Amino acid sequence: MKFLLLVLAALRFLTQVIPASGGGSKCVSDTQGYCRTYCHQGETALFMCNASRKCCASYSFLPKPDLPQLIGNHWQSRRRNTQRKDKKQQTTVTSS
């Protein structure tokens, strides 16, 4: 009976000492990340929470970058134009 009472007292003490967050406190409220010393695999550091801890967020929570939209095949038409200029220069060099 005394052993059971001792175990229960130890468990109660451990619940007060061990944090429930399990890996770090949250970063600021609008960021889906945790303050950690080292980021886990699949995470990146966004900013510093304090001098020794980084705000680590998963790649899936990061905003997607805005990429410019290409209109048609603009890059292919430029490539054809440079090839034509090269052919014209070759014909003028060989005919001279």
From Swiss-Prot:
Keyword field contains Disulfide bond: yes
Keyword entries, A-Z: Antibiotic, Antimicrobial, Defensin, Disulfide bond, Secreted, Signal
Biological process, per Gene Ontology: defense response to bacterium; innate immune response
Coarse class of the protein's main subcellular location: secreted
Biased composition (Basic residues): 76-87
Signal peptide boundaries: 1-22
Location in the cell: Secreted
Disordered: annotated span: 74-96
Pfam families cross-referenced by the UniProt entry: Defensin_beta_2 (PF13841)
Functional description taken from the UniProt entry: Has antibacterial activity.
Family stated for the protein in its record: Belongs to the beta-defensin family.
This protein's name: Beta-defensin 132
Gene that specifies this protein: DEFB132
